[in-house]
From Swiss-Prot:
The gene is mab21l2-a. Keywords: Cytoplasm, Developmental protein, Nucleus, Repressor, Transcription, Transcription regulation. The keyword Membrane does not apply. InterPro entries: Mab-21-like_nuc_Trfase (IPR046903), Mab-21_HhH/H2TH-like (IPR046906), MAB21L/cGLR (IPR024810). This is Protein mab-21-like 2-A. Its main location: nucleus. It comes from the Eukaryota.
Length: 359
């Protein structure tokens, strides 16, 4: 048994140093190329409208606010200033979303975003995005990369196609620190010792983001009130939780397997599903020793089996917001074929670790 585990860990480490590192290198090169274009577009936006200041900065070879959806698709979060005059209201009526309401006694004119406040005093995510979309469209025509970048039409999101190969979504957002959403109040679960009180305090202080984008749970049926809502995002909190042990390596292997074998019609699975299931695996195995290098094979196997279970049940709850289903709106047939393909993959890796040389 121990020999079989050791063989799997050896093969996974080999896979990590060959396949995963090559993937990381290729993506890093793409990110540099894409960010040159996006920075140029955002610089042009800022000239037209100084309220939209580019926050895309490189820190320690990483771009703050950039998320890799898949090797050809990225999301850049553009942090906006001055949320101060609004209260954060999160009553759970829209899973995964919250609203920003003008604080009592505050005048509209005190807000930097006065013309985007609705009659009932809400700061409209949709109105801000619509204005930003117009500015980006103008900037694309003026910027020095105009020959290689185009706006993607037929969407309320701000999406660019770069060199006909890459898609970048630029999402206006507010950073919320020092508060924690009521809809995530059940975290951490009281009977689970992970991640421990110090890490919990760090994560809650890190806070979350409010994004101006279409909400998972409302796609295709948004009323105007609902489309004024902001989408909750916890990227920094999640990244902080995944520090230490073989968690990062495990995520890297999962993303590489997804890119190479689970990029299926109907797009049932993305990197975020993998990250979510890794967080649940951390809860199931709360001891740090469960995340030693020698346990990499067991952890990966556990996550793949959990993924199959979620695909078969057609439900994948968000880690912090369990009322939000990350499979919402995905075609059942796509989830079914992803379950079959994941099962083939898991069986292959478990029964024949050497197959990783070909995967």
């Amino acid at each position: 048994m121990i020999a079989a585990q050791a063989k799997l860990v050896y093969q996974l480490n080999k896979y990590y140093s060959e396949r995963c590192q090559a993937r990381k290198g290729a993506i890093a090169k793409t990110i540099r190329e894409v960010c040159k274009v996006v920075s140029d577009v955002l610089k042009e936006v800022e000239v037209q409208e100084p309220r939209f200041i580019s926050s895309l900065t490189e820190i320690d070879a990483r771009y703050e606010g950039l998320e890799v959806v898949c090797p050809t698709e990225f999301e850049v979060v553009l942090y906006l200033n001055q949320m101060g005059v609004f209260n954060f209201v999160d009553d759970g009526s829209l899973p995964g979303c919250a609203v920003l309401k003008l604080s009592d006694g505050r005048k509209r004119s005190m807000s930097l975003w006065v013309e985007f406040i609705t009659a009932s005093g809400y700061l409209s995510a949709r109105k801000i995005r619509s204005r930003f979309q117009t500015l980006v469209a103008q900037a694309v025509d003026k910027c020095s990369y105009r020959d290689v970048v185009k706006m993607i039409a037929d969407t309320s999101e701000v999406k660019l196609r770069i060199r006909e190969r890459y898609i970048v979504q630029i999402t206006p957002a507010f950073k919320c620190t020092g508060i924690w959403p009521r809809s995530a109040a059940q975290w951490p679960l009281p009977h689970i010792p992970w991640p421990g009180p110090n890490r919990v305090a760090e994560v809650k202080a890190e806070g979350f983001n409010l994004l101006s984008k279409e909400c998972y749970s409302l796609t295709g049926k948004q009323s105007s009130a609902e489309s004024d809502a902001w989408v909750l995002q916890f990227a920094e909190a999640e990244n902080r939780l995944l520090l230490g042990g073989c968690r990062g390596k495990c995520l890297s292997v999962l993303k590489t397997l997804r890119d190479r074998h689970l990029e299926l019609p109907g797009q049932p699975l993305n990197n975020y599903h993998m990250k979510t299931l890794l967080l649940y695996e951390c809860e199931k195995h709360p001891r740090e020793t469960d995340w030693d290098e020698a346990c990499l094979g067991d952890r990966l196997n556990g996550i793949l089996l959990q993924l199959i279970s979620c695909l078969q049940c057609r439900r994948c709850p968000h880690y912090f917001l369990p009322n939000l289903d990350l499979f919402q709106g995905k075609p059942h047939s796509a989830l079914e074929s992803a379950a079959k393909q994941t099962w083939r993959l898991a069986r292959e890796i478990l029964t024949n670790p050497k197959s990783l040389d070909k995967l």
